[in-house]
């Protein structure tokens, strides 16, 4: 998760440029980042990390970024939003409720305990590759146990070491519904070797998506191949470096003409601040308003806690990759960000700080989102 303040961005204002034009003397240790539509600048990797370090300060809607170095010299343009027709109410409780009944807090605990044992899940470290491999193997086991025909898992490779994981459940149409979470973590003091359990950021979102996937595959409707739309479950590499993995995926989907009708992001799903009401935070900036309304419907139908609107700034997480490539996206987080987890990006982002009941509520929302849209005709 990335929430940097405007003050940090202004510290690098002297190097800002109007567009992606490589200045004289810029070499391979500089990276082109996008701070907003059409607003770019060249920074070092250390500067990228420094921009992120302020996530632990009191939250205010700040300036995230997308690393678009690989887009330099291309004709990238923001695509028109893929049109979609979302239901005004939840219509498939008969499909979704059995999925919810199968959700297991014990599974969430077990899977998260595995993820936090990696020294870190940094996208350029050996253990970052090992953690991605664990996710891939676990998804493969779940598919094999389900017996669902056509379900598959793939590695989406990048120019950096860590790969993303994509699981697909085919539907009758090519219209695609996606839920995603980044599985990388970072210790900002020592990204490559530092301890970064990343329990909340974003082991919590990763295991929520994994548990949702497990129970969607157990659905009788899914096993009978009755889904109207294709479902994908994503675990992204390199979010902490500037949405690297997710942006690579959605750029390819745009180039391939994919019909992604909805994308739900799960980043930070486990922290609740004592003394504050338990709630979801629905991010309203750089997301799709119509899909956000559908998300409210899902929360009201299938979860037991309230949802409030919040903002997180440009490119704060992977939903922004879908959004900038023309795909409708939403982001439901653990809080409104004023009460965000104070331990993010440190060695202290550990399981002891998390609430698995809250994570279970996120899992209910994910299976509600995926189950309802799986069965929606003319999406």
From Swiss-Prot:
- For the protein in the UniProt heading, the enzyme class is hydrolase
> Might you name a Gene Ontology BP term for this protein?
proteolysis
The cofactors required by this protein are: Zn(2+)
Which InterPro entries has this protein been placed in? M28_fam, Peptidase_M28
The residues that the entry says bind Zn(2+) 1 are 182, 201, 267
- Pfam family membership, one: Peptidase_M28
Keyword hit for Signal: yes
Q: How is the cofactor bound?
A: Binds 2 Zn(2+) ions per subunit.
| EC identifiers of the protein | 3.4.11.-
Q: Name one GO molecular function term.
A: metalloexopeptidase activity
Which cysteines form disulfides? 312-316
- Where in the cell does this protein reside? Secreted
Binding annotation for Zn(2+) 2 = 201, 240, 345
Tell me the CDD domains matching this sequence: M28_AAP
Q: Which GO terms describe its cellular component?
A: extracellular region
Task: Indicate which residues are glycosylated according to the record.
Answer: 202, 226
Keywords associated with the record: Aminopeptidase, Disulfide bond, Glycoprotein, Hydrolase, Metal-binding, Protease, Secreted, Signal, Virulence, Zinc
UniProt signal peptide = 1-18
| Purpose | Probable extracellular aminopeptidase which contributes to pathogenicity.
Assembly, in brief, is: Monomer.
Q: According to its UniProt record, which protein family does this protein belong to?
A: Belongs to the peptidase M28 family. M28E subfamily.
What protein does this entry describe? Probable leucine aminopeptidase ARB_01443
Biological classification of the source = Eukaryota, Fungi, Dikarya, Ascomycota, Pezizomycotina
């Amino acid at each position: 998760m990335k929430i940097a303040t405007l003050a940090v961005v202004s510290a690098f204002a002297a190097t800002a440029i109007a567009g992606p034009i490589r200045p004289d003397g810029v070499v391979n240790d500089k990276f082109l980042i996008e701070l907003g539509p059409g607003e770019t600048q060249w920074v070092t990797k250390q500067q990228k990390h420094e921009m992120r370090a302020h996530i632990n300060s009191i939250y205010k809607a700040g300036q995230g970024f997308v690393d678009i170095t690989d887009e330099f010299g291309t004709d990238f343009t923001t695509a028109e939003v893929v049109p979609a027709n979302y239901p005004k109410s939840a219509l498939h409780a008969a499909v979704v409720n059995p999925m919810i009944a199968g959700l297991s807090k014990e599974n969430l605990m077990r899977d998260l305990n595995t993820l936090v044992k990696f020294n870190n899940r940094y996208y350029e470290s050996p253990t970052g590759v090992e953690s991605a491999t664990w996710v891939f193997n676990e998804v493969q086991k779940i598919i094999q146990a389900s017996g669902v025909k056509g379900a598959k898992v793939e590695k989406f490779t990048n120019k950096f070491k860590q790969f993303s994981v994509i699981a697909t459940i085919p539907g009758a149409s090519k219209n695609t519904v996606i839920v995603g979470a980044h599985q990388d973590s970072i210790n900002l003091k020592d990204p490559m070797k530092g301890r970064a359990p990343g329990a909340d950021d974003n082991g919590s979102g990763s295991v929520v998506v994994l548990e949702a996937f497990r129970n969607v595959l157990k659905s009788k409707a899914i096993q009978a191949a009755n889904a109207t739309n294709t479902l994908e479950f994503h675990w992204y590499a390199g979010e902490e470096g500037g949405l690297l993995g997710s942006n690579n995926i959605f750029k390819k989907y745009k180039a391939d003409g994919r019909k992604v009708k909805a994308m739900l992001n799960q980043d930070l799903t486990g922290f609740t601040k004592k003394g504050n009401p338990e709630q979801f935070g629905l991010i309203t900036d750089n997301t799709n308003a119509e899909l956000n309304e559908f998300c409210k419907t899902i929360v009201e139908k299938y979860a037991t806690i309230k949802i409030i609107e919040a903002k997180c700034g440009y490119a704060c997480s992977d939903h922004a990759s879908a959004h900038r490539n023309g795909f409708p996206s939403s982001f439901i987080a653990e809080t409104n960000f004023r009460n965000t987890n104070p331990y993010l990006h440190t060695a202290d982002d550990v399981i002891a700080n998390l609430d698995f009941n809250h994570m279970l509520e996120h899992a209910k929302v994910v299976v509600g989102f995926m189950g309802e849209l799986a069965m929606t005709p003319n999406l």
